[in-house]
């Protein structure tokens, strides 16, 4: 089945167009994605290493879970869906703390994959038993908890998001709207 994505204007407003996901990335259309950061009560952060089968950034460490918003889907709906699909964790919508929206643009794979996204950033504060997770091998190679987030060349480049996350990782941290 072809996944359709709502195309946005560069200011984030709906363009009134739906396109297949591969066409969105081929053409460099702006679109939305949900990024879900899972944090343990003690401040540890859950990271995923992207599957080597992924078209973009294979094998790199990344956000706990993430994914495109399907056409007509809300960011909360996408966050709940993607977390379950990628790592088998059911997150109630009420557990998602919306933090902010970040705009990010990258060109990958020799210009064949243009990723112009508005990232809807969420935090979920809860303990997770890694052994109980069911990883989708098409999406996720492995997961791990880290106490100190130190992005380097083994991470998907999300500089602004990592900086924001380092401020939010403290228990009781205030979210930014």
What is the predicted function of each stretch?
Residues 1-35, 39-41:
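Acidic, metal-coordinating catalytic segment for phosphate/diphosphate chemistry
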Residues 5, 28, 44-45, 132, ...:
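A residue-level structural signature of the nucleotidyltransferase/glycosyltransferase Rossmann-like core
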Residues 13-19, 43-49, 131-135:
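Short, well-ordered strand-loop elements centered on a beta-strand within folded domains, enriched
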Residues 19-22, 59, 71, 98-177:
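Nudix hydrolase/Nudix homology domain
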Residues 23-34, 40-81, 85-86:
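Conserved Nudix-box catalytic region and its N-terminal flanking loop in Nudix hydrolases
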Residues 31, 91-94, 117:
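Short gly/pro-enriched beta-turn/loop segments at secondary-structure junctions
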Residues 37-38, 88-90, 112-113:
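Short, conserved, surface-exposed binding loops centered on an aromatic residue
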Residues 73-109:
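Internal catalytic-core helix/loop-beta-alpha segment
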């Amino acid at each position: 089945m072809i996944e359709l994505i709502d195309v946005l204007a560069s200011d984030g407003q709906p363009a009134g167009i739906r396109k297949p996901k591969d066409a969105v990335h081929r053409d460099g259309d702006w679109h939305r994605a949900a990024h879900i950061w899972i944090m343990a009560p003690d401040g540890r952060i859950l990271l995923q290493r992207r599957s080597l089968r992924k078209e973009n950034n294979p094998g790199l460490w990344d956000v706990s879970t993430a994914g495109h918003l399907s056409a007509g889907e809300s960011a909360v709906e996408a966050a709940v869906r993607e977390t379950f699909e990628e790592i088998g964790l059911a997150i109630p919508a009420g557990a998602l703390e919306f933090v902010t929206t970040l705009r990010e643009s990258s060109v990958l794979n020799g210009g064949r994959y243009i990723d112009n996204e508005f990232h809807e950033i969420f935090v979920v504060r809860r303990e997770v038993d890694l052994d109980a997770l069911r990883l989708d091998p098409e999406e996720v190679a492995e997961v791990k908890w880290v106490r100190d987030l130190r992005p380097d060349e083994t991470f998907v480049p999300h500089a602004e998001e990592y900086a924001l996350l380092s401020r939010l990782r403290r228990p009781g941290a205030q979210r930014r709207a």
